[in-house]
């Protein structure tokens, strides 16, 4: 039993030492940030965990899997990336807007900003929320953008 523990310990230590050399790249330092807009106005979105996703692709490497970027409730998104050209697309049927998978080409270098223009089914404006005697009340205007929505 002692011999098995010793062999297992040496094997584990060897694997640990070998694994240190596998990740020899510096971490990415460039920052991509953007917003999702309609007619120049930033959209508010449903903020569930992983709700609205964008996908980044970088050509020229063996791994062609997308880098998933999540949008926040205020319609912004961000990612820390390596410098280089990326393709940004919305995930298929993943947002409250007309499904459009146009590719946005983004050259990431340092601090980079971009805008994803979409056509939402509806917009909400003039939100007014009040609290009176532990009763929450709210009003807003809803505009239908897509007529067959």
Sequence positions of predicted segments:
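A short, amphipathic beta-strand motif
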Residues: 30-41, 75, 138
């Amino acid at each position: 039993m002692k011999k098995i523990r010793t062999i297992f310990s040496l094997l584990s230590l060897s694997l640990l030492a070998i694994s240190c050399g596998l990740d020899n790249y510096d971490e990415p330092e460039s920052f991509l940030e953007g917003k999702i807009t309609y007619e120049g106005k930033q959209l508010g979105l449903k903020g569930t965990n992983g709700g609205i996703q964008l996908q980044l692709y970088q050509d020229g490497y063996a791994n062609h899997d997308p880098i998933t970027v999540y949008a926040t409730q205020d319609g912004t998104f961000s990612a820390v990336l390596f410098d280089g050209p990326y393709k940004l697309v919305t995930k298929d049927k993943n947002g409250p807007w007309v499904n459009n998978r146009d590719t946005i080409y983004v050259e990431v270098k340092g601090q980079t900003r971009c805008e994803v223009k979409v056509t939402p089914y509806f917009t909400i404006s003039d939100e007014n929320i009040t609290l009176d005697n532990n009763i929450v009340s709210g009003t807003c205007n809803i505009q239908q953008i897509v007529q067959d929505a």
